[in-house]
Amino acid sequence: MSLPADLLLGAISSLLRNPPTSDAASPSADQPAVSSSRSDSRLVSAPLPAAPPAPTAIARNPRVSIHLPFQFLWYDITGTESSYTSLSIASRPEVVTVARPYRHARLTSLEAFVQPTASSATYPQTVDLCWTIDSVTPARSEILSVFGAQRIAWGSVHFSAPILLPAELSSLNPTIKDSVTYTDCPRLTCGFYRNDACVALGSSAPICGSILIRGVIECSAPINRPTPSS
């Protein structure tokens, strides 16, 4: 059965003026309104890998060292001396000999001491002593201006026991042998005071006391050289 043409055209016009609504035609019907100032979308990324372990120091073999004591006589005092004298510890033959078989050597202790003799009971003596770095040699009049310097007197009514003057290695460079040469190793300077009675004796003046130096050297890294046969 066919509809009249005028009815068919009227139905089509009505559909065009009022299109049917459907929830499926509106993709945002079930979605909440989104504010223009904020977005709910989030970026999801893979978790970061674990941090690598902290670096550690490379294990090194501990340095093997040996402690060698030394002692030597530096100066015999007769009371006829004047002015002053000085000594570099690193260049002293006794110290050089001890450290010769090793590449590295450092002082762990160092001291000078005066050993009186019986003659000092008749001929008392006086000296000024100080420790400095190797590149500093104070004049006789400057010795007591050095921190730690001492004026030492012995004999007669003064005590005759050994008198010590330790070196303060925290203010001096204790390394006496290394791959390089240092100018701040320990140096001992002594200022003398003449005794007129000893001067009158001339060359027959007795030894009234001796200045000795002793200490301990830590030596390491033996030098690879032929082993001596004797």
Curated annotation (Swiss-Prot):
Self-assembles to form a T=3 icosahedral capsid composed of 180 copies of the capsid protein. The capsid encapsulates the single-stranded RNA genome. It comes from the Viruses. Residues 19-54 are annotated as: Disordered. Signal peptide: none annotated. It comes from Grapevine fleck virus (isolate Italy/MT48). GO terms for cellular component: T=3 icosahedral viral capsid. SUPFAM superfamilies: Positive stranded ssRNA viruses (SSF88633). Residues 19-48 have a biased composition (Low complexity). Keywords: Capsid protein, T=3 icosahedral capsid protein, Virion. This is Capsid protein. Gene3D superfamilies: 2.60.120.20.
